[in-house]
Amino acid sequence: MKKTIIVTMLILLAVTSAAFAKNKAVTLPTSDIQVYFSPNGGCTEAIISAISKAKSEILVQAYSFTSAPIAKALVDAHKRGVHVEVVLDKSQRKEKYTSATFLANMKIPTYIDSAHAIAHNKIIIIDKKTVITGSFNFSKAAEDKNAENLLVIQSEELAEIYSKNFMAHKSHSEGLAPKY
């Protein structure tokens, strides 16, 4: 497993410069990994597309979550019967445009991770086989203004590792109650 991850990372490094020049998604021939860059590189669209295909479970960890389109996609998945859970950094409890309250109000289990100086994760795990991660915060600024990156990785092994990490953070987080 460790060797597979190292080889995958080396391949990613080899194609990063080409992907950056095109600012488009790149599917690597030896792995099912897509690479996106922002600004305006389709990161939000890739996330929404993956969420829309979810069948059973979506686990989200986020530092900054103000993206209305991503929040809406999670709510739509929840309404389709997909189990959705979200763990957010403590800053999202008071952030002006946070999606935290919206998600909690829509009956999506939402938790605040206050155990760390910053819970700086940007992770979505879908159906125990897809991992979305990178520097990309789930925000409009990340899509339109910031230089960010996003990986969409198809790997049950990696999804299991990230799911265990999600559960560890959820276990020390506080549930966010709906406001209405």
Predicted features and spans:
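Primarily the HKD phosphodiesterase
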Residues: 47-108
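Bacterial N-terminal signal peptides
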Residues: 8-15
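Solvent-exposed loop/turn segments at secondary-structure junctions
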Residues: 64-68, 90-94, 116-119, 130-131, ...
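Boundary at the C-terminal end of the N-terminal hydrophobic targeting segment
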Residues: 19-23
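Positively charged n-region of N-terminal signal peptides that target proteins for export
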Residues: 1-4
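Structural recognition of the beta-strand scaffold that forms the well-ordered cores
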Residues: 34-36, 59-61, 85-89, 111-112, ...
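Boundary/entry segment of secreted carbohydrate-active catalytic domains
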Residues: 26-42
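Signature of lipid phosphatidyltransferase scaffolds
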Residues: 24, 131-180
